[in-house]
Amino acid sequence: MPWLHGLCGARTRLAVLQNGIGHADRLASFVGQASVVPTIVYYNGERLGPDRVRFRRAGEHDFAVSDDPGGRAFASLLDGTSMRILRSPDFKTLAWRKLLLNTIANPITALTLQRQAVFRREDVQALCLAILDEAATVGRADGARLAPDEAKQILATLLTYPADAGTSMYFDRLAGRPFEVEALTGAIVETGARYQTPTPLNRALLTLLRATSDALADGDRR
């Protein structure tokens, strides 16, 4: 991305509002001396038309950043607005919690072509708990301070969302766009391999997501 490198200097701070983990490492070769500010996004947005977007809040905060100079600089940009910013000294744990939420919410809705109502099924809940337990083990290996019952907490949070809410991957499927699969399930499988932590369920999910995403990239929306 030469255009991005050209915009970055030693005093530049680049906020990355993207799902997943390891943003700074992924962007290091593109931003030169600029500082990367990983930013967690909690709200849900659905494009209803060219000039219409449905905005839904999904918790007490809209963004989360690390409580460091970069995070504080990002938060200051939104002073005086209605956006609610959490600054945390343990950003890694927050990032993993959001990743865990996304690793069930996005894939399951996209693969089943159903909105959040699909998580009301007991069999889907059981599958989600197994996927989450596996992913949480990887997160702990990576240094995230996740609770022993983190999987149950994440699923409980998901079940508070409106049944008609969608996810970014679900909307990508409807629009015929490839998925951001490598940043979500792909990141869990890759991190698990790095720590020699087995991820059979997430690896199976990754295979299905890649197959579906590749078909969308080829123009097959079925």
Question: Where do the language-model regions lie?
Answer:
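Active-site-proximal catalytic alpha-helix in oxidoreductases
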Residues: 92-137, 162-163
